Amino acid sequence: IAAAEEKRPVRRLSSFDFLTGIDDFSRMGGFRFKVDPDSEFINVSESLKIPPLKDIRELIAASAEIEKSEENNMLPDKKWIAQLVQPGTSLGGARPKANVTDTDKTLYVAKFPSRKDDYDVGLWEHFSHLLATKAGINAAKIKVLATGEKYHTLLSRRFDRTQEGKRIHFASAMTLLGLSDGDNATTRHGYLDIVDFIIQSCTDVERNLQELYRRVAFNICIGNSDDHFRNHGFLLTAKGWILSPAYDMNPTLNEYQSLLVSSTSNK
């Protein structure tokens, strides 16, 4: 939008630009940045303030307007960008989402209904997480909101923050394995790559391997084929890496997994 207004080419942003350009309060994981040791942390600004949960209906409306603009190959109105995108997010993913804060400053990821949805994706993801917990899986803490829309909004509590708000280093399996978007069963990558990382780099190896096995079996049982490397993560503890709570589990009713389940098959 800025490039169009200033009549200049779009500037290409590097991975580091995305990492440092995010609001400091909501940046995923434990990284914070300064220009020099004696300066303040960068991107601590009121203009980048994370919206409160009470504004959820306005955020859903902004998300829908941005999606509508994309469908029509148009630039969205700046007011929607200011409301939803300007605070910054390092969350990624295909669905419309944003960071929000509860009254006690707890951080949540809010996943909004999409204009393309033909079923209640948020409610099904909530149901999947409840099933996962019943199956003994360490799953992210989530809840759903009925906001007057056709479908529910899912709220997933950020697990890279302690109860007191302290930061915990997080990295996706894709990052820790040195892979790229699109690396999956089609490029001969799969769960055994994650197994190798756990054996070589994690603490409490046996427990993490058992946890991963439960997640593989569960994803197959519910038909969650969106199990790519970004949807598996690790937290860094004082003793080493451990699997993060499971997240983004949603039935997609696909016969094949995104990742190889064995050395040769993703079925």
What is the role of each PLM region?
Residues 1-267:
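Phosphate/dinucleotide-binding and metal-coordinating scaffold of catalytic cores
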